[in-house]
C-alpha cells in the first residue's frame, strides 16, 4: 500500500513522529520540517500505512522528475522503522522510478541491504557514499539531548576566530554564483548540478564572505533537506579560518529562523572534522548515506 500524506495536519503528525526517531530519521525529518514551512521545493511524503507507518519516502512530485539523467532532482529521502522489511514497499514501481538516474539519501546505513537487493531485482548499479553526520549542539540540545551526554564539546564555546572585516564582508550568495559553487562542489561540476545549486540559492538562506573584489571567496548553502551543504573556499584563501567563520554565521542565521542545523563531512577531510569540533557540532558516524543508482 502507498499513501501520499495530504494536508497540514498529517504532515505535522509525521514531523512529530520523526522527531522521536532522531538521529536515525534526521535526513527525512529535516526535509519534512521544510515541507511544513512552505514546501519551497514542492516535495511530497509517502508512507506505507497511516498513522502507524513503518517507512516514509520523501521525493519531488512526478511532474518535476522529467529528466531521467538528473539525479540531483530525482532524489528520495527515506526513513524506515523496519529497514529489514521495507524492500517490498521501496520496490513498488509507482513509488520510485528505478529506470531513472536517481539518488537515495538516509541517516540509516541499515537500508543498504534492501537497496542492494533491489539493485539485483530492478537491474541498476548502485554506489554507496557514507559520511559523518554532524548536528549543531543547539539543535541537538533541542531535538535529541541524549546525543550530548557522552560528547566532549570544544572549549572554544563554539565560536570561530575573528576575521579581517576590512578585507572580507559577510553577505549572501546570488544565483549568478552557482557556477562557482558547482565548480568546487565534490558532487558537482556539471550543468545539472549548477541548476540544482541555482534553485538552492533562490530558495534557502545562504552565507558567504565577499573578498576585496566584491565576489565570494568562501560560501555555504543549504539543500532541500535543510542540511548545510556545498561549502567551499577559493584555493588562494584557504587555511585562514574563513570557512569556519562562514559556517558559524550560516548556522546562526538558520538557528534564528528555528531551522534544525546539521551537515556532513567526508571521513578523509580532517580539516572540516576539526572545524566541526571547533563549532561544537556533534558527530554521528555512518549516519550520512547516499546511494547513487544508475539503470543497467
Swiss-Prot record:
Pfam families named among the record's database cross-references: Gly_acyl_tr_C, Gly_acyl_tr_N
Gene Ontology molecular function, alphabetical: glycine N-acyltransferase activity; glycine N-benzoyltransferase activity
EC assignment: 2.3.1.13, 2.3.1.71
List of residues that carry N6-acetyllysine: 16, 127, 141, 159, 183, 256
GO biological process entries: glycine metabolic process; monocarboxylic acid metabolic process; response to toxic substance
Top EC category: transferase
Recorded catalytic activity of this chain's protein: an acyl-CoA + glycine = an N-acylglycine + CoA + H(+); benzoyl-CoA + glycine = N-benzoylglycine + CoA + H(+)
Main location: mitochondrion
Alphabetized SUPFAM superfamilies for the sequence: Acyl-CoA N-acyltransferases (Nat)
Keywords annotated in UniProt: Acetylation, Acyltransferase, Detoxification, Mitochondrion, Transferase
Function: Mitochondrial acyltransferase which transfers an acyl group to the N-terminus of glycine and glutamine, although much less efficiently. Can conjugate a multitude of substrates to form a variety of N-acylglycines, thereby detoxify xenobiotics, such as benzoic acid or salicylic acid, and endogenous organic acids, such as isovaleric acid.
Similarity-based family: Belongs to the glycine N-acyltransferase family.
Protein name: Glycine N-acyltransferase
Species whose genome carries this gene: Pongo abelii (Sumatran orangutan)
Gene name per UniProt: GLYAT
Amino acid at each position: 500500500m502507498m499513501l501520499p500524506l495530504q494536508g497540514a495536519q498529517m504532515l505535522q503528525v509525521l514531523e512529530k513522529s520523526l522527531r522521536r526517531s532522531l538521529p536515525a530519521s534526521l535526513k527525512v525529518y529535516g526535509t519534512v520540517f521544510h515541507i511544513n514551512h512552505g514546501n519551497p521545493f514542492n516535495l511530497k511524503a509517502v508512507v506505507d500505512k497511516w498513522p502507524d507507518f513503518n517507512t516514509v519516502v520523501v521525493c519531488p512530485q512526478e511532474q518535476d522528475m522529467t529528466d531521467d539523467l538528473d539525479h540531483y532532482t530525482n532524489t528520495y529521502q527515506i526513513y524506515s522503522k523496519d529497514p529489514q522489511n521495507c524492500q517490498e514497499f521501496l520496490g513498488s514501481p509507482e513509488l520510485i522510478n528505478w529506470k531513472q538516474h536517481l539518488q537515495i539519501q538516509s541517516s540509516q546505513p541499515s537500508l543498504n541491504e534492501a537497496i542492494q537487493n533491489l539493485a539485483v531485482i530492478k537491474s541498476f548499479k548502485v554506489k554507496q557514499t557514507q559520511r559523518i553526520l554532524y548536528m549543531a549542539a543547539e539543535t541537538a540540545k533541542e531535538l535529541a539531548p541524549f546525543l550530548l551526554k557522552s560528547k566532549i564539546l570544544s572549549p572554544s564555546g563554539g565560536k570561530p576566530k575573528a576575521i579581517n572585516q576590512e578585507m572580507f564582508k559577510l553577505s549572501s550568495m546570488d544565483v549568478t554564483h552557482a557556477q562557482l559553487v558547482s565548480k568546487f562542489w565534490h558532487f558537482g561540476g556539471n550543468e545539472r548540478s549548477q541548476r540544482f545549486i541555482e534553485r538552492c540559492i533562490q530558495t534557502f538562506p545562504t552565507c558567504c564572505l565577499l573578498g576585496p573584489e566584491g565576489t565570494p571567496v568562501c560560501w555555504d548553502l543549504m539543500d532541500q533537506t535543510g542540511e548545510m551543504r556545498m561549502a567551499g573556499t577559493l584555493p588562494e584563501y584557504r587555511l585562514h579560518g574563513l570557512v569556519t567563520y562562514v559556517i558559524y554565521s550560516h548556522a546562526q542565521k538558520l538557528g534564528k529562523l528555528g531551522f534544525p542545523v546539521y551537515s556532513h563531512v567526508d571521513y578523509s577531510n580532517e580539516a572540516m572534522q576539526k572545524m566541526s569540533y571547533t563549532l561544537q557540532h556533534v558527530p554521528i558516524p555512518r549516519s550520512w548515506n547516499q546511494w547513487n543508482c544508475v539503470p543497467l
